[in-house]
Amino acid sequence: MRRNADLQVDGVDYSTTRLSHRWRMLKSQQRFFAWCQTLERPAPTVLTDRIMAGLWISTGVVMQGFDMVAGGQLAALPAFQKQFGAPVPDGSYMIPAHYLSTWNAIAPACEILSTFICAPLLERYGRKPGILAASIVSVAGVVLQQLATDWRVHLAGRGVNGETCRPELRGFFLCFFNTSIVFGQFAMSVAPGGWLAVYSLVCSAAVSRGSSLLSGKWQWWLPVVGMYTFPAILITGWPLFPESPYWLVRQGKVSEAQTSLRRIYGLHNDELCSVEVRRMEAEHQQARSIQGRLEQSNRRSILGFDSCAGVECFGYMHRKRTLTAILAASGQQMIGATFVIGYATYFLNLLHVRDYFDASIALYLVMLLASIAAFPLSEMVGRRAMIVIPQFVLCCMLLLIGVLGCVPDQRKASWGIVACIYIWAFIYEISIGAVGFVLASEIATARLRSATQGLVTATNAAWGLILQFTVPYMINPDAGNLGGRVGFIFFGTGLIAAIGGWYLYPETRGIPFAVLDELYASGTAPRRFRAVREQMMGVRRDPEADIPIHPQQLIA
């Protein structure tokens, strides 16, 4: 594309992809970073609007993180144990393993079902309507959980409740998805106040740590009632939320895409909006030309929805990309996230750790800080470097947890297990926990991105269904009672994910979607993407060869 002066915005040429521009883009596009609808207001008001808008955008994933650890947190509350558990000889109550398994497995089971229902709806009607529908359904789920007096009613409530960025900045902003989840997990563990005051307004009420100081049903009601905050925020801000510009471009609604971009960037950035729309159109057209179109007569439609996209994801041209995206997300579950994160408080309680709520608060704080650190590192270090080697380190930590679980004196060994869990959590959140979302979100071709993300969500939920159902049977005293030995199980599954990642994970940092299409179409080995990309840009980085590198020379 020819470079013209009208493509320069704040001294940056947006018609090209250059990693050296990412920090200047980030500085000049503050509105995109903390999106808001307000256009011209005094500076203090604009700042407040941007903060609140940024929090509003992340509300959905904060709610996901909040809900992911709700089962383990509630199971550790005495009032909840008394309401739904069975008495044990020492006079306390214990939640049976099959209750915990069913409660925690129902959400991913419903997530799998909703994925196949919602994915074609989102592709046809856009992303914005889905936010409103999900918020209304979430309210119904919270009501069922709050009013439940039987474990089956609580089960029903748990079940119900269960792409515009520049290439230079994709990793930075996609990492915020994971940080929002981690904040929700942290918020589920600590009462609002102090330096988390702003986020506490989002989370609204005191949660597990604060409610543990109460007695009676409000001890477990308070965390559940706090869930009303999230759909309330989403419904309130929904009228102001713009539709996805990328989706609008794919639908041929260019003028609406420009309007949506103006609302995101601000009216003073008309030039940038035009450049970005052209970039999205070019990527969309190039993706279609490289991957090819299936004849309309060969496509099948169900209720007006294209049913071939999911099958096409596993076709010859897309199979590797689909499996890479699935493994990048599912690898989180395989490496032990469900065990270490989802049941942290309950597991620490079973290990007889004193002040186990405080210990879990510290754990989620470590995870939050590590996830924040992943923001710049994903663009400075790259995706592959931040995932592949750390996955093998995580496997070693799981193996060590398993070994400590075999020590006869478990009261002493428990502190070693806790230390390993903390180290595991830090490495996980700074690596695959944050960057896995980045890779899974950007690896698919633009035309099949929605279908691929649906498959990623369904597969990840399937792993969640399996592990959420089985982990309580592994650790509960009335079942497997494995303790730290459960680390051996996740060491095995994690090693599979680590080895698969070594061969499948490419370096996608700063690579436009169209170039990714070319690299995959050429048959280039994913682990050599960076070298080939640098060769494409005229940068020689292969010291072992005296001739230029061609993509076909790097096929695995």
Swiss-Prot record:
Signal peptide feature range: none
Molecular-function GO terms, alphabetical: carbohydrate:proton symporter activity
Protein name per Swiss-Prot or TrEMBL: Major facilitator-type transporter ecdC
Similarity field: Belongs to the major facilitator superfamily. Sugar transporter (TC 2.A.1.1) family.
Protein's cellular compartments: Membrane
Membrane topology type: Multi-pass membrane protein
Coiled coil: none
Source organism of this protein record: Aspergillus rugulosus
Key word Nuclease present: no
Origin: domain of life: Eukaryota
GO cellular component: membrane
TM ranges: 51-71, 102-122, 129-149, 169-188, 195-214, 220-241, 333-353, 361-381, 387-407, 417-437, 455-475, 486-506
UniProt keyword tRNA processing, yes or no: no
Keyword list, A-Z: Membrane, Transmembrane, Transmembrane helix, Transport
Main localization, broad class: membrane
Lineage: Eukaryota, Fungi, Dikarya, Ascomycota, Pezizomycotina
Record-linked InterPro entries: MFS_dom, MFS_sugar_transport-like, MFS_Sugar_Transporters, MFS_trans_sf
Gene3D superfamilies the record matches: MFS general substrate transporter like domains
